């Protein structure tokens, strides 16, 4: 695709996941039946950290969306509803599904769907694609945090430390308190088995000097997708 010279319209949007409001930003070029791109931010982050991707995707013809996960940002950076203690990778999959449904309901979007995610958002995007393999045309993963299940089993997730055999109700993780549901959702997960139902196009980008998510997780994912 070539960069479009047409103006990009930017607007805020909201949609619902149960009784929680998800808030985000749409970047829309001119046209009809536009392909959709959903971009997911990482742990403790917010939509601001991935807006550069949505902007570029809109310039090459996508109707692109970024949003704040419910409870997925360091307070008060996130604009969506929800407590950080109620957030998990699986609730973020549900958020992604809600944004996809919203985007697909609009009169100017088509059937083509690209999912993109960074770090934890990469794992969320991969799990979402695995749940909807026929709906997702392309999957782009930047340093996807497939380490999260292993970290939960080891009892350390970023700044959080806990006994994996006796999960506490509340977990201290620097400026972002987590709930028991965060490790509980993934502690028994075989993530590389979970992602393999998706057989479409996948691009994985991962720096070899990453000290948080080791690049061998990206290599394992590439092998799982092969």
Give the positions of each predicted feature.
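N-terminal cap/lid segment of alpha/beta-hydrolase-fold proteins
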Residues: 1-31
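The serine-hydrolase catalytic nucleophile loop
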Residues: 43-55
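Alpha/beta-hydrolase fold nucleophile elbow
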Residues: 107-118
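Hydrolase active-site cap/lid region
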Residues: 131-178
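Conserved alpha/beta-hydrolase "acid-adjacent" motif
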Residues: 211-217
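Alpha/beta-hydrolase active-site loop
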Residues: 49, 85-106
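Short beta-strand/loop motif that positions the catalytic acidic residue
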Residues: 198, 204-206, 210
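Conserved alpha/beta-hydrolase
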Residues: 54-79
């Amino acid at each position: 695709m070539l960069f479009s010279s047409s103006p990009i319209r930017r607007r805020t949007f909201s949609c619902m996941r149960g009784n929680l409001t998800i808030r985000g930003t749409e970047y829309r070029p001119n046209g009809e039946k536009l392909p959709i791109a959903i971009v997911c931010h990482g742990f403790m982050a917010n939509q601001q950290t991935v807006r550069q991707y949505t902007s570029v995707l809109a310039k090459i013809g996508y109707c692109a969306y970024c949003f704040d996960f419910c409870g997925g940002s360091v307070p008060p950076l996130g604009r969506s509803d929800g407590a950080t203690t109620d957030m998990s990778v699986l609730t973020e999959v549900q958020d992604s599904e809600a944004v996809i449904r919203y985007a697909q309901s609009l009169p100017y979007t088509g059937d083509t769907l690209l999912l993109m995610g960074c770090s934890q958002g990469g794992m969320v995007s991969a799990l979402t694609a695995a749940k909807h393999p026929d709906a997702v045309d392309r999957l782009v993963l930047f340093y996807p945090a497939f380490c999260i299940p292993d970290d939960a089993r080891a009892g350390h997730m970023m700044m959080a430390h806990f006994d994996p055999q006796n999960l506490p109700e509340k977990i201290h993780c620097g400026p972002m308190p987590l709930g028991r549901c965060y490790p509980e959702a993934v502690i028994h997960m075989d993530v590389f088995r979970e992602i393999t139902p998706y057989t479409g196009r996948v691009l994985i980008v991962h720096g070899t000097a990453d000290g948080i998510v080791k690049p061998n997780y990206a290599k394992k994912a590439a092998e799982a997708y092969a």
